[in-house]
Amino acid sequence: MSVSLIVMGAAGRMGSILARLISEAPDLTLAAVLESPGHVDKLNAWEAGGTRVETDPAVAMTALPGAVVVDFTAPEATMSTARLAAAHGNPMVIGTTGLTDGNKAELSELAKRVPLFLSPNMSVGVNVLLEVLPEL
């Protein structure tokens, strides 16, 4: 069974890497890529390949119920997307840095309505270090 994913900020550094890796994974489906209207032209290759390209997260979530939203954007965009995801019932993975304590408290409340995974530091080096530290 394939998991459908929606990648927010797909023209950005992390978003573009994630979109590529998801598209190459046999058990994942890149259902949609999103970007702000000023940057959506950078996603033409995805659209040509058959992936849905959107500028409005609500449109993507309505069209793709249950798809997991992956967000590595900016705090304000992440919070807006998280509210929409909770309202539409889309699970969410958040890797955005710079979230305030207030943002995190709101995300905790939203997580009562929809599965939500938050890890603002998903860099390979940090995760390898965290894995190795207990063995030292």
Task: Locate predicted features.
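NAD(P)-binding Rossmann-fold cofactor-contacting core
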Residues: 21-47
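Hydrophobic beta-strand scaffold residues
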Residues: 30, 53, 92-93, 116-118
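Glycine-rich, highly charged phosphate/nucleotide-binding loops
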Residues: 46-64, 70-78
